[in-house]
Amino acid sequence: MKHKFLFSVFIIFFIFVFIALGSWQIIRLNWKNNLILEIENSLKNPPVELSKSNKENFLRIKTSGTIDFEKQIYLYNLNDSGTPGFEVINPILIENENYLINRGWIPFEKKDTLEINIFDQNDITGTLKTQGRKNIFKPDNDIEENYWFSLNREDILQFTGKEFSKYIIYLDGNYQFPRPKKITANISNNHKKYAMTWFSLAISIL
């Protein structure tokens, strides 16, 4: 009798745990959905003049500055079709503050060609975005060959001798090469699946 009672307590405890975990995922799901909606609305807004007082993630901006083509960074990445190449990233000085501007993707053979630097730095429209975390499975950057796999801040400081804003400017526009990267609200949102898993586990042990 005692063992049966303890077993029932054990089962009830885990049912409550699974329900609590499922409920937490529902809360996270609502938060994530609201965040995605905010980002989508922000990306639909017209660009505003970049200033020190209005910087935020996914803010569309317009500005001008002085680009450093000598310290141009070539970041390995795939384009939307899955073709490997480089994203071209430059230091840019805007109102005495250093930023990195991601001008878009090029195929490998365009690296170090003059045509990719035909660019009007006095008429820049783009989107601010904070840098994502480094994937631990990516190789180290080859700074000497200017072949990058991540925007490691220590490597960037070594390469450029400068520190930069946490916001990267992703260029908008109809450029052929580099081809600007389209910024979307494509954020991982698996909370519904996780919630269903926890609730299913709670039901399965009834």
Predicted ranges, named:
Residues 1-54, 59-206:
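Surface-exposed, charge/polar-rich loops and edge strands
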